[in-house]
Amino acid sequence: MKMIIQKVLSAKVIFEDNSFNSIDDGLLVYLGVHKDDIEKDIDLCIKKLLGLRIFEYNEKNFEKSIIDKNFKLLVISNFTLYGDISRGRRPSFTNSANAELGKEMYDNFMNKLYNSGINCYGGIFQTHMLVESVNDGPINIVFDTKEGE
């Protein structure tokens, strides 16, 4: 499982019917599911995400977590995070989870976040969405549960 975590002043996802979810201060997270991901990958990502000290406190950067600051999360599913461009010019998505596994893992990820009590919002799986954000920093962190295995 791979996350691109962006510290944002605001973020918004707009759906095909023009409805939307939005946040102010918080984190915009793009979540990619690997074909070999299991439940422990979800748990590890959530632990890292909720404990990540990325926000400032007393004029010091990287002191507080999203929980400490009571900020919000916007999580967008993004199968292209496992796109491989090492051969040719067209990305290969053979490492991305198929639609069934991807949806199951994304839904489980979101349910665990909701149950944690964090203020979080999501996108709609396997749907074209428009994402707007105002990055703060910019600060972008990439975390992949497959690295180091």
For the regions a protein language model found, what residue spans apply to each?
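N-terminal, polar/charged subdomain of small-to-medium soluble alpha/beta proteins
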Residues: 1-89, 100, 104-149
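Short glycine-enriched, charge-decorated loop/helix-capping segments at active-site entrances
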Residues: 90-95
